[in-house]
Amino acid sequence: MAIERTLSIIKPDAVAKNVIGQIYARFEAAGLKVVAAKMTHLSQGEAEAFYAVHKERPFFKDLVSFMISGPVMIQALEGEGAVLKNRDLMGATDPKKADAGTIRADFADSIDANAVHGSDAVETAREEIAFFFAGMNVYSR
């Protein structure tokens, strides 16, 4: 399997619960390495630009409002099959449907406050990493 990179965001609800370390431990236990990371409080413009693909969806405004409601932890992860591996770790978007032991089953409150974001494909991951880490170094380890 190929070494890939994927973008992960620990959303405001999970940051507020102080579970960043527990989530990082799951990444590392699954063989994913953090190759870039930063904590930030997204502006409305940043959140709207990042989630622009959802602009016409009925949940867009609520998603943007939620994503700017508190700080987020953003990281680029690297490892074999990183995109799928991270999606497996996250679990289903709706935590009620997420398998036991996944990040969302353990830490998410609702389909809106669902703890984490992860890239859905290698190409999307490239774009998302460039969005948040433009001009910053991303280090393979």
Swiss-Prot record:
Task: Write the Enzyme Commission number(s) for this entry.
Answer: 2.7.4.6
Q: Which GO terms describe its cellular component?
A: cytoplasm
Q: Which PANTHER family match?
A: NUCLEOSIDE DIPHOSPHATE KINASE, NUCLEOSIDE DIPHOSPHATE KINASE DDB_G0292928-RELATED
Domain of life the protein comes from? Bacteria
Which molecular-function annotation in GO is an example for this chain?
metal ion binding
Quaternary structure note: Homotetramer.
Query: Could you tell me which InterPro entries the record lists for this protein?
Result: NDK-like_dom, NDK-like_dom_sf, Nucleoside_diP_kinase, Nucleoside_diP_kinase_AS
Keyword list (alphabetical) reads:
ATP-binding, Cytoplasm, Kinase, Magnesium, Metal-binding, Nucleotide metabolism, Nucleotide-binding, Phosphoprotein, Transferase
| Species the sequence originates in | Polaromonas naphthalenivorans (strain CJ2)
Where does this polypeptide localize?
A: Cytoplasm
Q: Where does ATP bind?
A: 11, 59, 87, 93, 104, 114
- GO biological process terms, semicolon-separated: CTP biosynthetic process; GTP biosynthetic process; UTP biosynthetic process
- State the similarity comment: Belongs to the NDK family.
Question: What is the name listed in the Swiss-Prot or TrEMBL entry for this protein?
Answer: Nucleoside diphosphate kinase
Query: Which purpose does this protein serve, as stated in its record?
Result: Major role in the synthesis of nucleoside triphosphates other than ATP. The ATP gamma phosphate is transferred to the NDP beta phosphate via a ping-pong mechanism, using a phosphorylated active-site intermediate.
Reaction it catalyzes: a 2'-deoxyribonucleoside 5'-diphosphate + ATP = a 2'-deoxyribonucleoside 5'-triphosphate + ADP; a ribonucleoside 5'-diphosphate + ATP = a ribonucleoside 5'-triphosphate + ADP
Instruction: From the record, give the transmembrane residue ranges.
Output: none
The cross-references to Gene3D superfamilies, in alphabetical order and at most eight, read:
Nucleoside diphosphate kinase-like domain
